[in-house]
């Protein structure tokens, strides 16, 4: 009896400890369960995706995929020379009126003597930049003895005696009332982004990814390299408009091509690395612009590598997913067999025959489907609102940083150095938290930094600059994550068109940021940043998680992919549990494990109360293989 009491006491204390331990670890078990369900959903989706099966046979990331990713990285690096070069081509110069008329009466005058005799001085003793003494028909001795008294604006142009570089400013004399309007230059660039995103996005879905990538590279070659030969500032703006079109066209089509060739987490890793190399390109551009003294030479150096790149572009292949949705199944088989040959793999014949079945129905879609398809409309509306807020925050932070008057080379270098690790950290975030939670985490960090900026004192400025850098660190990760998220949410048949449409929201956010920041110098723009962060968090919660699931090819969506979270709670867990867990429970190593019951609460109007019991598994998720039914 005493032993029974001791046993009951020990069992009771052990049960109490187990209950206490379970209560403490319940959140982590819920989080692990969520990760498990997400991975099982990806496994279930890949089991039904014939293209994913073919890619498994080819090799998920073999030599062909490496070559594809590298060939898309290189233009991303070079594109920075055309996108961000205006920061260094419009550096401020100190102009003085050209007074070479005095050399006719005093040809042996030095430059300092010439300026001293012909230019008026400011109260602080420096020469005035936009005024000169009126020329007089005197000899040199009379000018030195009596001096000149009457001034006028510069009549014979300007000189730049203290300029160390040759820029657009001193090339086209954009000084003394002829200064370029920065807002106009930004408007030209954003207009190019706007038209290019719509045009190239539409053409990419109609003609294919490969021809539009080739067209974008030709645009870099003609208008980027050709910028070095412009003869006026208006020609420069004209060329910059088409450079913006080529830039956004290449960004949309290259991401679509890479994501449609890769599967699983390789998609996210490739896009993040592409963005990281884009940032590395800015670092290279900054260092080169600091050393190269002539702006035309800088444009030539940035455009020359495009020539050999165009010659090697034939190595790329069209997206097989796009070929399949367009009904070009035989061409899709050819490019898949070519990829398998490069990877030294063999595709089973039965897998290729299965592609024939999916290719009999040609997916038909148009831009009107973004309005007529309810699910697609909700998704595009939500991600468009997030893109607007993200663009507004990004541009406002950049304008706030530029407002401190720091050296442009220092600012661009520090921004780029900060952005590279921020983007690389996103690989880990996406692996462990998924798209939605990783996006929410980075947006929360941006919100925190904006709140700090809102309440920080204006002095010392070093504290504000540090906070701005931390905010830009978080924003760099947000942009990469959400770009991947957006591309995965859109179907293959309208992926490029959808990316082009959400670019409208990005342009609208940029214009709003510039307009608000220009009108006020208070903390109002930062307050709007905080508000935009909250709105972005709200809208991002409306879109479904994509994780490592297979890309969608058509606009036909399942009910379980509804955008409403409450509907997902009803459908997704039950579907995944019924289809995937039945095979896992059958494993002999799992049948003896403890069961953890997780109950999903139904809505008030539900007819049945559903309870999902998920086995607690000691095996890693990667070792579980679902058997086909």
UniProtKB/Swiss-Prot annotation:
Family, as annotated: Belongs to the major facilitator (TC 2.A.1) superfamily. Organic cation transporter (TC 2.A.1.19) family.
Function: Riboflavin transporter localized at the inner mitochondrial membrane of the spermatozoa midpiece, which is required for male fertility. SLC22A14-mediated riboflavin transport is essential for spermatozoa energy generation and motility: riboflavin is the precursor of FMN and FAD, which are coenzymes of many enzymes in the TCA cycle (the citric acid cycle) in mitochondria. Required for sperm motility and normal sperm flagellar structure.
Protein's name according to its UniProt entry: Solute carrier family 22 member 14
Tissue expression summary: Testis-specific (at protein level). Specifically expressed in male germ cells (at protein level).
Gene Ontology MF, one: riboflavin transmembrane transporter activity
Keyword Transmembrane: yes
Biased composition (Polar residues): 7-16
Pfam families found in the cross-reference section: Sugar_tr
SUPFAM superfamilies xref list: MFS general substrate transporter (SSF103473)
Major location category of this protein: mitochondrion
Glycosylated residues (UniProt): 98, 116, 124, 149
Inactivation phenotype: Male mice show severe infertility. Defects are caused by impaired riboflavin transport that suppresses the oxidative phosphorylation and reprograms spermatozoa energy metabolism by disrupting flavoenzyme functions. In mutant spermatozoa, fatty acid beta-oxidation is defective with significantly reduced levels of acyl-carnitines and metabolites from the TCA cycle (the citric acid cycle) and accumulation of triglycerides and free fatty acids. Sperms display abnormal flagellar bending and impaired motility and capacitation.
Residues in the Cytoplasmic compartment per record: 1-67, 205-209, 262-269, 317-378, 431-436, 485-496, 545-629
Annotated segments matching region Disordered: 1-21
Bilayer disposition of the protein: Multi-pass membrane protein
Example of a GO biological process term: flagellated sperm motility
Gene3D superfamilies: MFS general substrate transporter like domains (1.20.1250.20)
Gene Ontology annotations for the cellular component aspect, listed alphabetically: mitochondrial inner membrane; plasma membrane; sperm principal piece
Top-level taxon in the UniProt lineage: Eukaryota
Keywords: Cell membrane, Cell projection, Cilium, Flagellum, Glycoprotein, Membrane, Mitochondrion, Mitochondrion inner membrane, Transmembrane, Transmembrane helix, Transport
Record flagged with keyword Magnesium: no
Catalyzed reactions: riboflavin(in) = riboflavin(out)
Topological domain ranges for the Extracellular compartment: 89-183, 231-240, 291-295, 400-409, 458-463, 518-523
Residue spans crossing the bilayer: 68-88, 184-204, 210-230, 241-261, 270-290, 296-316, 379-399, 410-430, 437-457, 464-484, 497-517, 524-544
């Amino acid at each position: 009896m005493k032993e029974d009491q001791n046993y009951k006491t020990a069992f009771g204390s052990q049960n109490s400890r187990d209950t206490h331990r379970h209560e403490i670890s319940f959140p982590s078990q819920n989080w692990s369960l969520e990760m498990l369900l997400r991975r099982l959903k990806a496994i279930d989706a890949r089991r039904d995706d014939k293209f994913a099966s073919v890619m498994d046979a080819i090799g998920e990331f073999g030599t062909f995929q490496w070559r594809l990713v590298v060939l898309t990285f290189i233009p991303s690096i070079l594109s920075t020379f055309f996108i961000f070069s205006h920061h260094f081509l419009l550096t401020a110069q100190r102009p003085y009126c050209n007074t070479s008329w005095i050399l006719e009466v005093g040809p042996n005058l030095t430059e300092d003597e010439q300026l001293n005799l012909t230019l008026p001085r400011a109260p602080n003793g420096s020469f005035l930049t936009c005024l000169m003494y009126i020329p007089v028909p005197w000899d040199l001795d009379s000018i030195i003895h009596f001096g000149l008294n009457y001034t006028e604006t510069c009549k014979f142009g300007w000189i730049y005696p203290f300029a160390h570089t040759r820029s657009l400013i001193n090339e086209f004399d954009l000084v003394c009332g002829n200064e370029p309007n920065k807002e106009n230059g930004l408007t030209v660039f954003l207009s190019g982004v706007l038209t290019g995103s719509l045009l190239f996005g539409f053409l990419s879905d109609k003609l294919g990814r490969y021809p539009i990538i080739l067209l974008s590279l030709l645009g870099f070659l003609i208008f980027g390299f050709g910028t070095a030969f412009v003869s006026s500032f208006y020609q420069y703006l004209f060329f910059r408009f088409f450079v913006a079109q080529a830039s956004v066209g290449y960004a949309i089509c290259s991401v679509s091509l890479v994501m449609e060739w890769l599967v699983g987490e390789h998609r996210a890793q490739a896009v993040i690395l592409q963005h990281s190399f884009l940032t590395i390109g800015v670092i290279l551009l900054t260092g080169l612009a600091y050393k190269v003294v002539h702006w035309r030479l800088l444009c030539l150096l940035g455009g020359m590598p495009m020539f050999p790149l165009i010659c090697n572009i034939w190595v790329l292949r069209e997206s097989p997913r796009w070929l399949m949705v367009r009904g070009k199944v035989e061409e899709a088989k050819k490019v898949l067999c070519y990829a398998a040959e490069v990877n030294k793999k063999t595709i089973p014949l039965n897998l290729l025959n299965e592609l024939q079945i999916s290719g009999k129905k040609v997916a038909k879609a148009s831009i009107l489907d973004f309005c007529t398809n309810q699910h697609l409309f909700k998704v595009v509306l939500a991600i468009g609102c997030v893109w607007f807020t993200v663009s507004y925050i990004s541009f406002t932070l950049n304008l706030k940083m530029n407002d401190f008057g720091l050296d442009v080379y220092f600012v661009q270098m520090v921004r780029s150095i900060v952005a590279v690790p921020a983007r690389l950290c996103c690989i880990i975030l996406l692996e462990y938290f998924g798209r939605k939670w990783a996006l929410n985490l980075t947006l929360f960090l941006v919100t925190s930094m904006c709140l700090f900026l809102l309440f920080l004192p204006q002095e010392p400025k070093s504290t504000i600059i540090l906070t701005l850098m931390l905010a830009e660190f978080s924003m760099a990760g947000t942009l990469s994550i959400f770009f991947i998220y957006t591309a995965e949410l859109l179907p293959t048949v309208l992926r490029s068109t959808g990316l082009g449409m959400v670019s409208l929201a990005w342009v609208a956010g940029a214009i709003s940021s510039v307009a608000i920041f220009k009108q006020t110098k208070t903390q109002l723009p930062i307050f709007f940043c905080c508000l935009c962060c909250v709105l972005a968090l709200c809208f991002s919660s409306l879109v479904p998680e994509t994780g490592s699931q297979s890309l969608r090819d058509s606009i036909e969506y399942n009910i379980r992919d509804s955008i409403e979270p409450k509907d997902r709670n009803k459908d997704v867990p039950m579907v995944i549990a019924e289809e995937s867990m039945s095979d896992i429970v059958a494993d002999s190593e799992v049948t003896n494990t403890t069961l953890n019951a997780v109950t999903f609460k139904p809505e008030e109007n539900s007819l049945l109360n559903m309870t999902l019991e998920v086995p607690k598994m000691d095996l890693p998720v990667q070792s579980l293989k679902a058997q086909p039914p």
